[in-house]
């Protein structure tokens, strides 16, 4: 009993032999040789694009640089490295400090190598001040040294008594609560 796949393959080869007059010899390892010249003698050159052994168009290598290397050179040439690194710190704050700390803190801005951070409570601000050295080490490992050299950590903002866009100067301190 023969394999149905082998039978189908032989039928396809027989049909190709009927149409083309020849089929490649599968017993030889010389798959890279040129097909025989036509019976008329001189072989006409075919027009079209050259293709590789798999039939795909050959790559034309011009020595072009990759997009990433071109962007990196341009970033260095324009001096944007520190700005991009600062943006990375702001957008990846949770990755730098962990989910628990990031849940209670927020990066406000980066100015003159200083990272300004606001915390939900004074307790979180105190804890972050204790961890300041470790946070700066992680930032230096991820984005490089001398990008951020100092953390400015603030607690929550006190509530304001002002309401609305306009403000009249107050009358000074009063005995409000008592």
UniProtKB/Swiss-Prot annotation:
> Which InterPro entries does the UniProt record give?
DciA-like, UPF0232_actinobac
Short name of one Pfam family: DciA
Give the residue ranges for region: Disordered: 16-55
Q: Which family does it belong to?
A: Belongs to the UPF0232 family.
Database matches in PANTHER family: UPF0232 PROTEIN SCO3875
HAMAP family with a match to the protein in the record: UPF0232
Q: What is this protein called?
A: UPF0232 protein Cgl0005/cg0006
Species: Corynebacterium glutamicum (strain ATCC 13032 / DSM 20300 / JCM 1318 / BCRC 11384 / CCUG 27702 / LMG 3730 / NBRC 12168 / NCIMB 10025 / NRRL B-2784 / 534)
The taxonomy runs: Bacteria, Bacillati, Actinomycetota, Actinomycetes, Mycobacteriales
């Amino acid at each position: 009993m023969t394999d149905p796949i082998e039978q189908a393959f032989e039928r396809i080869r027989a049909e190709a032999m009927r149409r083309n007059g020849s089929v490649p010899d599968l017993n030889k390892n010389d798959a890279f040789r040129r097909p025989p010249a036509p019976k008329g003698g001189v072989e006409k050159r075919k027009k079209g694009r050259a293709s590789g052994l798999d039939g795909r168009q050959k790559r034309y290598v011009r020595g072009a640089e990759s997009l990433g290397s071109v962007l990196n050179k341009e970033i260095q040439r324009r001096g944007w490295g520190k700005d991009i690194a600062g943006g990375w710190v702001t957008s990846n704050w949770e990755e730098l400090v962990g989910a628990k700390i990031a849940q209670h803190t927020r990066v406000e801005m980066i100015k003159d190598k200083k990272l300004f951070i606001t915390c939900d409570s004074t307790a979180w601000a105190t804890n972050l001040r204790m961890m300041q050295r470790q946070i700066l080490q992680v930032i230096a490992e991820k984005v490089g040294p001398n990008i951020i050299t100092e953390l400015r950590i603030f607690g929550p903002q006190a509530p304001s008594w002002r309401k609305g866009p306009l403000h009249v100067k107050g009358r000074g301190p009063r005995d409000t609560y008592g």
